[in-house]
Amino acid sequence: MQKEYKTITEISGPLVFAEVDEPVGYDEMVEIETPSGETRRGQVLESTSEFVAIQVFEGTSGIDRNSSVRFLGETLQMPLTEELLGRVLSGSGEPIDGGPEIEPDEEREIVGAAINPTAREYPEEFIQTGVSAIDGMNTLIRGQKLPIFSGSGLPHNELALQIARQASVPEEESGDDEAGSEFAVIFGAMGITQEEANEFMDDFERTGALERSVVFMNLADDPAVERTVTPRMALTTAEYLAFEEGYHVLVILTDMTNYCEALREIGAAREEVPGRRGYPGYMYTDLAQLYERAGRIEGREGSVTQIPILTMPGDDDTHPIPDLTGYITEGQIYIDRNLNSQGIEPPINVLPSLSRLMDDGIGEGFTREDHPDVSDQAYAAYAEGEDLRDLVNIVGREALSERDNKYLDFADRFEEEFVQQGYDTNRDVEETLDLAWELLSDLPKEELNRIDEEAIEEYYVEDEQAAQTAD
């Protein structure tokens, strides 16, 4: 029998403090009934022999000392079934799409169990996003965690939607008639506005991407406490689809900055000693608990790949949120404000971007045999073009050699033709590599010193006029 308490002593922001006379488990679920008869859900955040701190999912407005508290003896769980695909849920896992109630095959605690390191399979095989700057230069690998670093006002939401629409596992698609049936997307939105939520849903429904997706929506006016639950709900669903149903699951979480702000708000309500810039000292551990749920398990068909998106306050990549994220994850994709102002879509700056696992999932047997060399050469050529732009600002373009001008032209074309593709263009990896070769072929063959000679002979695009002159 559940015991009921009317011992609330304090209410602070999203937290309720109550006295108890018996042990209460950490993370235990709680029901709070207000004097008006309304029931709110909560979770034990801190427990001692004399009192508990409860975080309330629906907010503390209307709760007072006369409210009753019931401890349910279980932790927060996510109802799981393959039928979740195509559904839209609140940040706490409740259906909000007008569809039927979820009839779960099982329920799991949202905290999740760590993958045994000895059972982890090393991430291999690439995921095709259809975005050249990612597929060609910073390839996403199955089981990887690759964040997108953005800034306020930049189009990271548009890029997130493009990836959600286009992402696929090419060999799975070509392996049977049900193209893409083994791929699923979990989209977890935290602290977004109603306008952004409407844009997300319109895009999912218009493009048909919702059929293979599970969407979790936590809005800006929803309680901060729910924001801390949303990514755990999303990842628990991803783990079930990946390791029980055999899907390759891509988890897109936006915006992790809002998640960390919720941690700070709750920490302040608990009067915790703050860490860097007021964020909790345990934020690194908390983020690691989320990001480390990506991966593959030996003997299981599926995989969980993560793309967390975060906006860097003040475009500062030394801010605690991107800084700690960078320590845990395996690279980063940078959204660039200057490229955005030039109208480049998506404005991905490939130079500071990095995919640490890229080399393990590209090349012969994965993408194409020339991919590693082409990527290296394009990086080098674009970097040289960028350096020369700085020089042009000092001495003018007329002072540069013919060779230098070719690299400047390459840098311009690289941004305008390779990075630029719009948010509705889906390029497969063959198109991406062919486009890279077209740009690299503007450089003399002797400049392509990072590419194997056989690949140059096969893919280098000879200038027709030059070829006729040589004949």
From Swiss-Prot:
Keyword flag rRNA-binding: no
Topology versus the membrane: Peripheral membrane protein
GO molecular function: ATP binding; proton-transporting ATP synthase activity, rotational mechanism
Gene Ontology CC terms: plasma membrane; proton-transporting two-sector ATPase complex, catalytic domain
PANTHER family (UniProt xref): V-TYPE PROTON ATPASE SUBUNIT B
Name this protein carries in UniProt: A-type ATP synthase subunit B
Superkingdom of origin organism: Archaea
Gene3D superfamilies: 3.40.50.12240
Function: Component of the A-type ATP synthase that produces ATP from ADP in the presence of a proton gradient across the membrane. The B chain is a regulatory subunit.
GO BP terms: proton motive force-driven plasma membrane ATP synthesis
